[in-house]
A protein has these predicted regions:
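Non-transmembrane "mature" sequence context
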Residues: 1-131
């Protein structure tokens, strides 16, 4: 493995660890039975770590149902070969979503109540490498 390729792999692993450590994740065994169907229909996304499937808690409402805005965001992001790319998009601050009255970018997962802004940010992201 080349040094550059190894460096990218280490960076990816560090990013995954950061996303897992800083987020609230629930295991496939603690989510509703419909979760596989929801994921297949593009209503939610899941990631795999250490042989287990995990789902970001922010995708669900208080009754453990998928938030409709997640489906819209995933549709705008388009098909991704790597679910960790989707997780990273939700997790890290996005230049197209800023705090009200300020210019500091915020993470899409923290702006899900700002429907138009997060869906627009997903639309703008599609086909790019970042915000």
């Amino acid at each position: 493995m080349t040094t550059a390729l190894h460096s990218l792999q280490v960076q990816r692993e560090d990013t995954i660890l950061k996303i897992l450590a800083e987020g609230e994740w629930i295991g496939a065994d603690t989510v509703p039975a419909d979760v596989a169907g929801w994921q297949q229909r593009g209503w939610i996304f899941g990631v795999e770590a250490e042989g287990q499937r995990y789902f970001a808690r922010y995708q669900f409402d208080d009754r453990d149902q998928p938030l409709p805005v997640i489906r819209e965001i995933l549709a705008e992001l388009g098909p991704a070969t790597d679910p960790w790319t989707i997780a990273a998009w939700f997790h890290f601050p996005n230049g197209w979503i800023v705090e009200e009255g300020c210019t500091a970018p915020i993470a899409p997962k923290d702006a899900l109540d700002r429907h138009v802004a997060v869906v627009d940010a997903a639309r703008r992201f599609r086909g790019t490498f970042g915000a």
